[in-house]
């Protein structure tokens, strides 16, 4: 799910060259995601690729971390070169009408930092995707050997008690989860389609996306940046159990992936946090060290964003049948609640076993156990087969889905101690189980992005 590269210099000959790339999507129990997961994973290379000529010394990575202290904005820039060198890097940042420059000297090193201060930059905020620009030029032996140009955003994110703050102001998440999938494009969703999806999301009155359950293409996050949509990017630790917690190879794989996510996606202001896991067996004692290690990778390498854990405090019956995960001892809080910044509750009351009234009871119970951080409902929902309507509200009807979602949203909005929600999910997608004919139909629009009844009812609820 993340970008990768090969150095093919030794295979290139003078004249015309032909290259063939062989890939597979082999599933590995020690992988991330693990061997079993409930979404369709297409084979082949389904994201953009390019052939690139690089000099001996080039800009390997760069991250722009915006901060605000005492009313003053500044950026901390971190740059990594391909190897240690004696070079100079010129930096130019433009934000609104303001332009700042700096020069970084590499004296036999491959990493360097710089801080640039701004008086009144263009500030990125939810609903207002104001972006700034950074240009880097690497000069070695009086010659420009490499250049890089990117966009970033001035914004801050933090927590204050149970509140989530963006740019110092309280922000309530009203969102839905996505999967990286479209019936026409498969996993190769183009940027213009993502932009269309996000505009439809905003039309419904929603302001955030949980990009479940793996890193998406950069085109998706760039679209979120432009549209002012808040996003949580996610590490594919999906329903991990003691096997994964006890395997050093799994932890090494996941921590490496977390580091790559930061380096590849860290300049997107729409990403306000990293989700470290979904519905894993977090009550197992060995889970604490495993997920604390992942949390630490994110916080040590990116202190400007939050971490989220999406839990099943009371496991839905379907998960208990499929796999023994998150077996919650009565009255206990998941062990990840001790260190993550935001605690997520996944619960499908009204769909899998429990009555609809169970979700608000669960939220009140969780809030009594976790009092020092934001709590969000990270998943809730019901399936609806598009076009199925009935006054008797049977399962799989648009009417039942709409009634249940609106009821649960009202209960969430009544509770000031809940920092927001992510509906599961925005559009239907192909999956391997728990589905109608291989489709998870919990979307409030169908896979072709045609709205169901729930879309319009939620729109009316959130925009009275």
Spans of features found by a protein language model:
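Active-site mouth of glycoside hydrolases
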Residues: 4-8, 29-42, 157-354, 360-361, ...
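Short strand-edge motifs at loop-to-beta-strand transitions and within beta-strands
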Residues: 2-6, 110-116
């Amino acid at each position: 799910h993340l970008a990768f590269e090969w150095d093919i210099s030794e295979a290139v000959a003078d004249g015309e060259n032909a290259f063939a790339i062989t890939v597979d999507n082999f599933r590995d129990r020690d992988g991330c995601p693990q061997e079993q997961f409930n979404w369709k994973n297409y084979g082949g290379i389904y994201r953009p690729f390019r052939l690139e000529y690089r000099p001996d010394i080039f800009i390997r990575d760069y991250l722009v971390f915006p901060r605000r202290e005492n009313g003053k904005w500044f950026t901390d820039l971190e740059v990594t070169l391909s190897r240690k060198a004696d070079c100079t890097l010129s930096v130019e940042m433009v934000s609104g009408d303001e332009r700042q420059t700096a020069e970084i000297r590499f004296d036999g090193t491959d990493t360097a930092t710089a801080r640039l201060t701004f008086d009144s930059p263009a500030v990125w905020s939810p609903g207002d995707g104001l972006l700034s620009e950074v240009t880097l030029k690497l000069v070695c032996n009086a010659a420009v050997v490499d250049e890089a140009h990117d966009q970033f955003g001035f914004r801050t994110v933090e927590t204050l008690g149970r509140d989530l703050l963006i740019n110092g102001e309280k922000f309530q998440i009203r969102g839905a989860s996505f999967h990286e999938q479209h019936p026409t494009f498969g996993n190769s969703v183009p940027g213009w389609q993502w932009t269309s999806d996000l505009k439809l999301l905003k039309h419904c009155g929603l302001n955030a996306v949980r990009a479940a359950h793996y890193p998406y293409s950069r085109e998706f996050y760039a679209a979120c940046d432009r549209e002012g949509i808040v996003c949580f990017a996610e590490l594919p630790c999906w329903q991990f159990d003691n096997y994964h917690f006890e395997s050093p190879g799994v932890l090494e794989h996941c921590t490496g992936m977390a580091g790559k996510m930061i380096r590849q996606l860290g300049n997107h202001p729409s990403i306000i946090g990293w989700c470290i896991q979904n519905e894993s067996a977090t009550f197992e004692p060995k889970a604490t060290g495993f997920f604390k290690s992942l949390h630490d990778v994110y916080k040590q390498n990116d202190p400007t964003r939050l971490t989220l854990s999406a839990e099943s405090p009371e496991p839905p019956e379907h998960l208990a049948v499929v796999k023994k995960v998150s077996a919650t001892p009565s009255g206990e809080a998941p062990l990840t609640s001790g260190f993550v910044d935001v605690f997520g509750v996944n619960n499908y009351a009204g769909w899998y076993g429990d009555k609809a009234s169970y979700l608000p009871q669960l939220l009140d119970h969780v809030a009594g156990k976790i009092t020092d951080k934001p709590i969000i409902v990270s998943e809730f929902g019901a399936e609806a087969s598009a076009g199925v309507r009935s006054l008797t509200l049977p399962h799989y009807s648009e009417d039942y889905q709409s009634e249940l979602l609106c009821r649960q949203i009202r209960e969430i909005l009544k509770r000031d101690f809940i920092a927001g929600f992510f509906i599961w999910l925005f559009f239907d997608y192909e999956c391997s189980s728990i589905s109608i004919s291989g489709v998870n139909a919990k979307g409030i629009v169908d896979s072709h992005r045609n709205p169901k009844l729930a879309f319009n009812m939620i729109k009316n609820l959130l925009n009275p």
